[in-house]
Amino acid sequence: MKHEFARKLRRDQTDVERKLWFALRSRQFGGFKFRRQQPIGPYIVDFVCFEASLILELDGGQHGSDYGVAYDLKRTQFLGKNGFKVVRFPNHEINSEFDNVLNAITHHLRNPLSLPLWERTQNLALSEAYAKLSA
């Protein structure tokens, strides 16, 4: 069932997913193989590079809601516990700062254990938001 849904998501990808996939597909991004709309555990991730244990998530407007923040945190924690590094990009960055997004992906592929300050801050904000929702 989940695999059929993943197949549907691949068929019906958004414009930003299509734009990023065009840059990542066929090992043309630094020789790394990415998969799109890949089931991992109970989730379907937007893009994954298994050899780098890197997941890329593209976040639309729904991710800013209280529920979206809590869900993303739970999902990121699950994926992290299973050995993946999750990097999130808001959809507007794909459209307006695409070169910066590609540079950030390159950085994460070359430095799999490093988290830039902005990402550490974002993860802290997600944790605080989740704590408020759990209280």
Indicate where each model-derived feature is located.
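Residue-level detector of family-conserved "landmark" positions at structurally sensitive sites
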Residues: 34-37, 89
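Glutamine-centric residue-chemistry signal
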Residues: 28, 37-38, 62-63
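Solvent-exposed, charged helical/coil patches
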Residues: 1-32, 112-135
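A generic structural motif
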Residues: 32-33, 84
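Basic, amphipathic alpha-helical patches used to engage nucleic acids or provide basic targeting signals
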Residues: 9-13, 41-108
